[in-house]
Amino acid sequence: MATGSKKVDEWLTDRYPDIRQQAEESNALIYFADESSVRSDYHSGTTWAKKGCTPIVEATGARFSINMISAVSAEGTMRYMTIPGRFNTDVFICFLKQLVTSHDRPIIVVTDGPPAHKAKKVQKYIEQEPRLLGVHILPAYSPELNPDESVWGYLKSGHLGRMTLRTKGQFLRAVRTCLKSLQRLPRKIQGFFRSEHTAYACLETFV
């Protein structure tokens, strides 16, 4: 369990249990959200070569990047959105709208604290949207508390990092295919909530 700072301890012992209680009383679904970017020249893992030869990872020389945002729940659901430009407040609100319209129950969002997440426009949207019960900010410098961080590890290290993508179109399709494949793996997503630092948010924690 992630501990070691007053803010983290407060999150684990007070703030998140209160959020969880609100979710139970309202039959709300808690989503942990995060955004990231990935480049087409990212490589991970290992490759092979004949004995005595240096392994070479194939690269195309072309570089593309895509910004993304995703959210996962301890129930194994996931939502995501690829972003053609930069991430900003309007994009975050658009994603929040996608979350609340894709479920027939209230939504609570937990995320980190960049300015786009705490802007006045976001607060105004929350006030006007009864299906969104709140956007709660994780303690600063504590990404390990966010189960959604595992989405990017799955995407970059497990899939994209082993591909050779020659065009921006191929790259975008590969990103969306990987995210969609993960969306169809609820048990995999639930596993993101069972690591040392995210187990506090696992459903079994509250049984």
Description of each model-found segment:
Residues 1-207:
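Short functional hotspots at interaction and active-site rims
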